[in-house]
A protein has these predicted regions:
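Structured, amphipathic secondary-structure segments that form assembly/contact surfaces
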Residues: 56, 63-170
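Core segments of small alpha/beta cavity-forming domains
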Residues: 7-96
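Long amphipathic alpha-helical segments used for membrane anchoring, targeting, substrate engagement
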Residues: 1-6
């Protein structure tokens, strides 16, 4: 669930918004016509906040936090990755230091279902450690990461929450 009125997890991110005359800009206007509460800037605030909650909950293996934020299909993928990490005796540490840039890359309205894809450039520490504490992957250093996440919402629903339906690292 992403409250589009939420404040950004980290202030000061550079915003990249589509030209209103572009296909993405036109799709955002179609979403706004069907969902009067939709505002692209507030949506990005919520997406940034959700990103922080989701990556940190994933690192902790906090399934209870993840479940309401993700579609069933996305949750199944995250759950499988957490289970594999647990089975291997590994732990993940993720510290989101800042959101440097966020932008809307794609938008679509299919029937009552709105989908908005965002690109997030963040600075984070991300590492996986074995039982003995040795680093399996990642590093203690702050690394710039780029992620592309797609959120979805039924615009006829009284629930203003958006769910993560897809994620990739760019």
């Amino acid at each position: 669930e992403v409250d589009i009125g939420a404040k950004p997890a980290q202030g000061g991110a550079r915003r990249v918004m589509p030209d209103p005359r572009s296909p993405v800009g036109e799709a955002l206007m179609q979403i706004q016509k069907r969902d009067r509460g939709f505002d692209p800037n507030r949506f990005l605030d919520g997406a940034e906040a959700a990103f922080g909650m989701i990556v940190e909950a994933f690192a902790r293996g906090d399934r209870a936090t993840l479940k309401p934020l993700l579609s069933d299909e996305a949750y199944a993928g995250f759950d499988q990755a957490i289970a594999a990490r647990e089975a291997a005796g590994e732990t993940q540490r993720t510290e989101l230091r800042s959101v440097e840039e966020s932008g809307i890359e794609a938008a679509e309205l299919r029937g009552n279902i709105a989908e908005v894809t965002v690109r997030l450039v963040t600075d984070q520490i991300n590492l996986v450690q074995a039982r003995d504490g040795s680093i399996v992957s990642g590093a203690e250093a702050v690394t710039e990461m780029t992620d592309v996440w797609t959120f979805q919402r039924d615009v006829t629903s009284s629930d203003p929450s958006w769910k993560l339906v897809g994620s990739t690292s760019a």
